[in-house]
């Protein structure tokens, strides 16, 4: 019996970020592909038009953990759903992205939680 797309999506939905990363690496090895985004050249002379568009996807970057690292680790776990070890490794490895490709409201919310915990955060 074939696995339905819904079953696959349900399984992926229940995975942690670390498990998803391992899954992507397995796909890359199995099928000989790369998950890197392909850069598409923009239209020539479109600088003014691009500036007029508002950015919709944001990356929340933990620039520095600050003095209260425990609170920052708790905030990272709350935002990402990572386990304790993964969250600690992320905080220890700062600067690192905490969330990628999120909308402005979610990025601002994550930034506020991290800053309230004592971290220095950048939105890109």
UniProtKB/Swiss-Prot annotation:
Any one GO CC term of the record: cytosolic large ribosomal subunit
UniProt keywords, alphabetically: Ribonucleoprotein, Ribosomal protein
GO molecular function: mRNA binding; structural constituent of ribosome
Gene3D superfamilies: 3.30.1390.10, Single helix bin
Residue runs in coiled coils: none
Tagged with keyword Cell division: no
Keyword Nuclease tagged: no
Cysteine-cysteine disulfides: none
GO process annotations (BP): translation
Record's function text: Forms part of the ribosomal stalk which helps the ribosome interact with GTP-bound translation factors. Is thus essential for accurate translation.
PANTHER family: 39S RIBOSOMAL PROTEIN L12, LARGE RIBOSOMAL SUBUNIT PROTEIN BL12M
Family: Belongs to the bacterial ribosomal protein bL12 family.
Record text on subunit structure and interactions: Homodimer. Part of the ribosomal stalk of the 50S ribosomal subunit. Forms a multimeric L10(L12)X complex, where L10 forms an elongated spine to which 2 to 4 L12 dimers bind in a sequential fashion. Binds GTP-bound translation factors.
Protein name: Large ribosomal subunit protein bL12
Organism lineage string: Bacteria, Pseudomonadati, Pseudomonadota, Betaproteobacteria, Burkholderiales
């Amino acid at each position: 019996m074939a696995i339905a797309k819904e079953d696959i999506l349900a399984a992926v939905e229940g995975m942690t970020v670390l498990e998803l990363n391992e899954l992507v690496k397995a796909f890359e090895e199995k099928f000989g592909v790369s998950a890197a985004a392909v850069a598409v050249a923009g239209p020539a002379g479109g600088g003014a038009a691009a500036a007029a568009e508002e950015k919709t996807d944001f990356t929340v970057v933990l620039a520095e953990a600050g003095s209260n690292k425990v609170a920052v680790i708790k905030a990272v776990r709350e935002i990402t759903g990572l386990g304790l070890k993964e969250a600690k490794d992320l905080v220890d490895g700062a600067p690192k992205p905490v969330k990628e490709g999120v909308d402005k409201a979610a990025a601002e919310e994550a930034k506020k939680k991290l800053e309230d915990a004592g971290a220095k955060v950048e939105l890109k």
